Amino acid sequence: MPAKGPLQSVQVFGRKKTATAVAHCKRGNGLIKVNGRPLETIEPATLQYKLLEPVLLLGKERFAGVDIRVRVKGGGHVAQVYAIRQSISKALVAYYQKYVDEASKKEIKDILIQYDRTLLVADPRRCESKKFGGPGARARYQKSYR
């Protein structure tokens, strides 16, 4: 077996609420898989365009030289989709910064941020905790005077 050069790979994560997606990006031929399945098979089908946004924005040629494998867990369907798209975007930016050049990384970053900032920056909002005196965070139990 011939000796290969050092493996060019980066590992980044994307988060939304309690969903966490970890993306491994390495030199390859344009594969993007989520939990071992291609992007096109991810449910719900209505959110597939959200997953494909980074690819559609940047064009397939930028993804042609890399393979991205994503593991996602936690959260609901929508939160997982947002975590996946963020991890894919961050993985490509990190790969270009480390192994390609700074100019193309900046170009990719500018395109993504101009379209939607959450593609690269996590949404800090979290669920507010429940308090006593009511069924939820802000709602109070009904009060009766008679």
From Swiss-Prot:
GO terms for molecular function: RNA binding; structural constituent of ribosome. It holds the Pfam family Ribosomal_S9. GO terms for biological process: maturation of SSU-rRNA from tricistronic rRNA transcript (SSU-rRNA, 5.8S rRNA, LSU-rRNA); translation. It comes from the Eukaryota. The keyword Transmembrane helix does not apply. It is found in: Cytoplasm. Belongs to the universal ribosomal protein uS9 family. This is Small ribosomal subunit protein uS9. It comes from Ictalurus punctatus. The gene is rps16.
